[in-house]
Curated annotation (Swiss-Prot):
GO terms of molecular function: DNA-binding transcription factor activity; transcription cis-regulatory region binding
Keywords carried by this UniProt record: Cytoplasm, DNA-binding, Repeat, Transcription, Transcription regulation
Location in the cell: Cytoplasm, Nucleoid
Gene Ontology CC: one annotated term: nucleoid
GO BP annotations listed: negative regulation of DNA-templated transcription initiation
Name this protein carries in UniProt: Transcriptional regulator MraZ
Length: 158
């Protein structure tokens, strides 16, 4: 379903879990499931989401149906083309699967939290087919540093 819009601030709990906002959970097609035993493997199981480290210092969350579309393009990349092989390696190195429990929480690994600079507070930005997770101070800096660029880009595309 998707259509994630807006932003909310939440906190990572002591076990490294993040509560997905209720308004985003209502738009998801993923069904939370506490019975999943592992956070590794395929997120297409009930309750699974894909989480990806992004070069800008954020994390992105995708539902399996959305990630499947992206993966279609990735699998078409050639292992015999060095640039395409590198892209596949970098993408998959930056990717993990996480389960969502019945309370709507996901457990994020220390590696992923460190990548995003998230220690406790996190801003969850709804970006239509994905959710973007930011450390609040990083997001504030990106928005502040790119205010004039936003005007130019918005003028170009809207």
């Amino acid at each position: 379903m998707s259509g994630f819009i807006g932003k909310e601030q939440h906190a990572i709990d002591d076990k490294g879990r993040l509560m997905i906002p209720a308004r985003f959970r209502r738009r998801m097609t993923v069904v939370p499931d506490e019975s999943l035993k592992s956070s590794r493997g395929s997120a297409s199981d009930a309750g699974g989401l894909y989480v990806m480290k992004v070069p800008d210092g954020s994390l992105e969350l995708y539902e399996p149906s959305v990630w499947a579309e992206k993966e279609q393009a990735i699998v078409r990349l050639s292992d015999f083309n060095p640039d395409e092989r590198l892209l596949k390696t970098l993408l998959y190195e930056s990717l993990d699967c996480v389960e969502m429990d019945r309370q709507g929480r996901i457990a994020l690994s220390r590696e992923f939290l460190q990548h995003a600079g998230i220690s406790r507070d996190v801003v969850i930005v709804g970006a239509n087919v994905k959710m973007i997770l930011w450390a609040p101070e990083k997001l504030s800096k990106v928005v502040r540093d790119n205010a004039s660029r936003f005007q130019v880009l918005a003028g170009r595309y809207f």
